[in-house]
UniProtKB/Swiss-Prot annotation:
Residue ranges of every copy of the C-type lectin domain listed in the record: 11-130
Organism, as annotated: Calloselasma rhodostoma
Assigned keywords, A-Z: Disulfide bond, Hemostasis impairing toxin, Platelet aggregation inhibiting toxin, Secreted, Toxin
Source lineage: Eukaryota, Metazoa, Chordata, Craniata, Vertebrata
Protein name per the record: Snaclec rhodocetin subunit gamma
Chief site of localization: secreted
Molecular function, one GO term: toxin activity
Tissues in which the UniProt entry reports expression: Expressed by the venom gland.
Amino acid sequence: DFNCLPGWSAYDQHCYQAFNEPKTWDEAERFCTEQAKRGHLVSIGSDGEADFVAQLVTNNIKRPELYVWIGLRDRRKEQQCSSEWSMSASIIYVNWNTGESQMCQGLARWTGFRKWDYSDCQAKNPFVCKFPSEC
């Protein structure tokens, strides 16, 4: 059994919280790293986790913007584009909105916060943080 901090929700041995205060992607990632050891913007690894996060956003983001930041952004190196999670996990599960895989990624409101879509990294959006729970 494991515990999350007060105000955080547990799923599959990780703790999650949705935050209403709009931040840029970098500001949100920095905020998440300050909340807990190994904290980052949320990574999503399965349909079940996507459902959990979508429900968390629906229940906790008071005035949802078009996007809610997740921990995925494009890294551009020598004309090669690759997406990676902020927590440096490799991408195994993907759920892009059709044709979208550039800039910073957010959960799109018009998909019920289930599909990923791009947004300008400097846009200010609500966000979800995630960290591994302590045993």
